[in-house]
């Protein structure tokens, strides 16, 4: 993206006022803001790095934020946001869960709160298109998530989950998936989700294992055969699936 711009602090209070008007739960502190012209879009945007932003007492580690607005609004010292692009780094899932507790009840919310006990968004970028009332029209996101522990059931805990993701309104691409369950290691995997008339999901996982007597006893606690015999198996498996 080719840009030109100037640096100022004149819009700080205006931006903070607009943010708090939309949601008073935000606490925002800004350093100097750069007004830039995106030559590709012929559109102005306001840019700042490492702003101090808290929501419901949770610090959101935003590294950069860009707010696109109409040229005539800027000239009149007003802001009408139509696009927001921001990046985050090192955002712990505990902080994300605290924010999620404030949203409306849902099965997805309950699952995130009860089944994930660790993890981190290493880095992610979000591109949000909004209307003049700040209602979300379109979005894109990409990033890297790591060190997630996911509780599937009381006896099934998948650890050290990591993956890259790309998401928009029509697709979700998850790749470079790695994870471990006891002594079974998922070394690479991918999931593609396409939203058409119906959801279409395709995926594949490669798992590696080297199971000895102790590992079999952990995996098959109720099967006497593995307790009574010494067994060792090693190898790899490729799993592919498709859902429509």
Predicted regions and their residues:
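Small-residue helix/turn framework positions
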Residues: 43-52, 80-125, 138-149, 157-158, ...
